[in-house]
A protein has these predicted regions:
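Short, flexible helix-loop junctions that flank or precede catalytic/ligand sites
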Residues: 1-309
């Protein structure tokens, strides 16, 4: 079986055309995508285990699904009205961040005459030019790394930049500078909740830099969408969202190192299109989509949520 598996994985690299297998054989891990014309696109994670090769392959639809069918609320899609600043989509691995970001890019592509540059590792959804021009660059195929690609993007006359992930302080700093200089920057982090996301960004930097970074972040951040996929009663997975929209009060909290108070603002600001994770879970429970046990399991404050069930 291992020999057969290795042969299949080598064939996958052949199908991926520009992807070389040698770096994977040396490092033991790789992540990429490829397409078979007329069939589908695939995202592949290859790795070594017990001295042999293994892979996980996921099918990616050629066409983006309807955001409404995915459960993405209009309040998130309306964030594409932003023309500058930073918009973050966060959540654990496999929570659908890439799909949400792709839907946001597609909305901009369909409604605005912009130049959109996406920097992804790997490319998942392919965007046709609609009203916008979309340049999609894949890390390790079209460019060396996120930081190099982001710095180059600033010289390529972008209106919108999608940065697949902010992995280090230099990339985060450059992304904030891009947002500060009149671009709309969309990116993702593996965090749950706006407060945790903001704290994570600031904590990446040295203590001597953190106050300045907090000041800069308070000025460029426009919204944080945090999502989880939760099991529905019918066996499918459905998204639950937290939505934080920047307000003067939240901006002051970031500057004053009071990010722990942001959750309270989100809980009490439904009129400003904000939504807490628990209110999203409660709505899913009340609609009969998920069980009470599931809602409590994924809740950020199960004691408070239990009183509302």
């Amino acid at each position: 079986m291992p020999d057969t598996t290795e042969s299949l994985i080598r064939q996958i690299y052949v199908l991926a055309q520009n992807r070389k297998i040698e770096p994977f054989l040396e490092s033991g891990d790789d992540d990429f995508s490829f397409a078979i014309r007329g069939l589908s696109r695939y995202r592949v994670s290859t790795y070594k285990q017990r001295g042999s090769l293994a892979a996980v392959i996921r099918v990616i639809a050629f066409e983006l699904p309807d955001p409404a069918l995915l459960g993405i609320p209009d309040s998130i899609l309306q964030l594409t009205d932003l023309t500058k600043g930073m918009l973050l989509v966060t959540g654990p691995a496999g929570s659908g961040k890439s799909t949400t970001l792709a839907c946001l890019i597609d909305r901009i592509n369909s409604t605005r005459e912009d130049h959109i540059i996406t920097l992804e590792d790997p490319l998942e959804f392919l965007h046709r030019h609609k009203k916008s021009i979309v340049s999609q660059r894949e890390i390790a195929t079209d460019t060396d790394n996120y930081l190099t690609a982001l710095r180059a993007a600033l010289r390529q006359s972008p209106d919108v930049i999608l940065l697949g992930e902010m992995r280090d302080h230099e990339t985060i700093q450059t992304a904030m500078t891009a947002a500060e200089t009149g671009h709309l920057v969309l990116s993702s982090l593996h965090t749950i909740g706006a407060a945790n996301t903001i704290s994570r960004i600031i904590d990446v930097f040295e203590p001597s830099q953190q106050h300045q970074i907090a000041m800069q972040l308070s000025m460029v951040l426009r919204a944080v969408v945090s999502q989880q996929l939760v099991p529905a009663i019918d066996g499918h997975m459905v998204p639950a969202f937290e939505i934080m929209i920047m307000t003067p009060a939240i901006s002051n909290m970031i500057r004053d190192n009071k990010t722990h108070q942001i959750d309270g603002i989100i809980y009490t600001s439904a009129k400003d299109e904000m939504r807490s994770m628990d209110s999203s879970l409660l709505q899913l429970y009340q609609s009969g989509t998920i069980t009470a046990e599931t809602a409590l399991h994924y809740s950020t404050n199960p004691d408070m949520l239990r009183k509302k069930l």
